């Protein structure tokens, strides 16, 4: 039995697609299109490294992640972007993007904003978890088309003030998926200014 707030959630997209395809006969080669699942064997040396480091795999990791991993992530951000981060305040390893994106909505989206249901801005095409996380926190997903004219990034700048004032979150993906457009520093700066 699920809480009432989850009763209106749609079925995830990939099982819906599977149901549409089931029962159809196909000729020719078939390909496993499982999303995000590696399709190739890992290099053999990885097996040796894993076997050499099995100690500790019988316990759950710390809630905040493995400290050595967090420090490595902080170091990478500094080397790559010159950004100074704190491993205990800015880094939280998650089991995958779905978990992290969903939990961000759960943590940041209020029940009401300006006495009404908040919006969550979502670029379209979109990653299914954007919509599901918005619906899970009783927010209204507002899909913003991304096309050649917008540089394949969402144009949140043209939205009316009454929508922006009721917006609790806005998703941005750079590079955009599936188009691969990369947000510029100017775009991201303008987006932060819009949010403020």
Report the location of each language-model feature.
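Generic N-terminal amphipathic, Lys/Arg-enriched alpha-helix
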Residues: 1-7
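N-terminal small-domain helix-loop-helix segment of the aminotransferase-like
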Residues: 7-99, 103
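Conserved core of the PLP fold type I
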Residues: 58-196
């Amino acid at each position: 039995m699920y809480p009432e707030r989850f009763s209106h959630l749609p079925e995830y997209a990939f099982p819906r697609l599977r149901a549409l395809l089931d029962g159809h006969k196909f000729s020719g080669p078939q390909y496993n299109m499982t999303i995000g699942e590696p399709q190739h064997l890992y290099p053999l040396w990885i097996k040796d490294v894993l076997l050499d480091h099995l100690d500790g795999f019988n316990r759950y990791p710390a809630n905040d992640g493995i400290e050595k991993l967090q420090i490595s992530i902080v170091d990478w951000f500094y080397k790559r972007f010159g950004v100074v981060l704190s491993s205990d305040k800015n880094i939280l390893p998650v089991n995958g993007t779905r978990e992290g994106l969903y939990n961000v909505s759960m943590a940041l989206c209020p029940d009401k904003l300006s006495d009404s249901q908040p919006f969550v801005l979502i670029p379209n095409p979109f990653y299914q978890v954007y919509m599901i996380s918005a619906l899970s926190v009783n927010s209204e997903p507002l899909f913003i088309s991304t096309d050649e004219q917008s540089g394949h990034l969402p144009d949140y700048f043209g939205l009316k003030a009454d929508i922006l004032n009721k917006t609790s979150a806005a998703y941005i993906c750079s590079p955009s998926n599936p188009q691969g457009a990369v947000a510029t520093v100017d775009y991201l700066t303008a987006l932060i200014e819009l949010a403020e």
